[in-house]
Amino acid sequence: MPIDRIIAKDDAFAICVEGGHIVVLGSNANGTAYGILELSRLAGVSPWAWWGDVTPLRRHYLALASDYLTIQWPSVARRGFIAQGHGLDSHRLHQLLLRLRGNLLRHADCDGRGAKCMEIGERWLPSTQPGRIYAEMKTAYDQGARHEWVARIDNPRTVAYQLSLFMDMAWNITYVNATNIPSHFHAWLTEQFGEQAADRLLPVLTEYYHLVGIRRPEQMNVEFMADAFGNELERYLANYEALVKALTPIAALVPQERSEAFFAWVDYPVRAAWLMAVKQLQAQEARHIGRPSSFARDDEALSSAVRSWTAYQQLLALNRKFSGMLDGKWEHTLSLAHMPLMAEPKFPGPLSHDAIKRFAQQGPEPFNLDVGNTITRNACHFRRATQGVQTVSMLGHSMKAVMVPPGGSLSYSFFSELRGKAVVRVAAIAMPDYLGHDIRLSVRVDDGEAQIVSVRPDAHSPQWQTAEQRGQVIVNVDVNLTRNSHDIEIRALDTPVFIDQLMVDYDPVREFYIFPVTAEQL
């Protein structure tokens, strides 16, 4: 028995087979509990059995190989979360904490040397990209945050995978790396819904995190441009609708005992995010097109308004279904009073029953991407990178943002068919720096002077609030191009910088929201 390998480590455990018996060893009470709960995982009991309604499937026995051995101990000494939601069962929270191999349930923010607190505060839908959790926490760990990790959440049920990823990294920092986040997500989905469903769910939910990474549903109060790049608004909605259509055949692969978990963690978030996007963006389009004096006769504005109104009615019905599931077990968790965007959409004028009937079957229109006079690419398609550069899966609008270490750089080349004024737009992802350093990057075009910009988070800055909601900080560098080959160099100066996308735009005053990257470049 490997007692000597765990006895000097806090919260460690070992599981082995001795004389035909399964043996669990713990270095302390926590370690023993973690070991026993590890056995329950091996038997198919999810840590989310109660919080996620992941009903355990019946098994007749648990068998381990005669040479089975696992020895585990934590990478971070104190691991846990702050649950700020109302009416949460403290006993159930402590059970979940143990099942996630945590040892700290805080009621106030973490503080002190070696401590790191991360905000995963969604109160409605899960919208923090998995790559964001990995990037922020791994960077903090590398900078010395190894004593205490705390996730600030509202309700653990809402952010089940995010909290699982956070706690898994705190337990063993090597579980996840920059490129295997999708594999970790697949393993988690398999634990909840089975491998067959997980195989089909992974691409669907990866695209879900792509779309919510472009804009969080609870912040869908932004203008997408119908006249930008071949109608970025309709393409965004069409991508959402494709996800919704993919859910029905997958649901049939989920065991009946897990159907409530599938609805709460997959069906509801995807559909609700889609309906919120349709509701908000089509209402915006109706207001943009229509005028109060002519709204009742404006078929284009009416079509957008009816699509928005229909989505709103469907969203209300979906919320009622969520609140009523399992005899209202989770009704109190869906408090949407704090969300102004959940209100009825506003149009230039009233909608008649006749208009609703006429345009009720309207859906997203097919629009092909038109990159116009731009050269656009995701940052991961660099020509050259210095040592230490890493592509991070499931992060950014590209879902492949690039981490550039201090002093490191990315280089790109392009050929300009046009000459004259242009702007180089660089989309970075601002991460809070654990050590409090400034977060600066420089952008140099050809042999010109490097433009140095800070992308450090500043909660008091309106520009930062816009960037936080967008998920990107846009750095613009004015250039005067010749018809020739050109080079762009992006360098991190103080701390790691995450670069997402870049664009050479020959229309410096262009209004748009989404960088026009083709599907082949994703």
Stretches with model-predicted labels:
Residues 1-73:
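Contiguous, structured surface segment used for ligand recognition
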Residues 2-7, 88-90, 95-115, 179, ...:
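Ser/Thr/Asn(+Pro)-rich, low-complexity disordered segments
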Residues 21-23, 78-80, 95-96, 102-104, ...:
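Beta-sheet entry/capping signal
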Residues 23-26, 82-87, 103-107, 117-131:
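The substrate-binding groove and active-site-proximal loops of carbohydrate-active enzymes
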Residues 27-29, 86, 102, 107-114, ...:
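An acidic- and aromatic-residue-enriched active-site/binding cleft used to recognize and process polar
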Residues 48-109:
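An acidic-aromatic substrate-binding cleft motif
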Residues 111-385, 485:
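Substrate-binding groove of N-acetylhexosamine-processing glycoside hydrolases
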Residues 347-522:
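Extracytoplasmic
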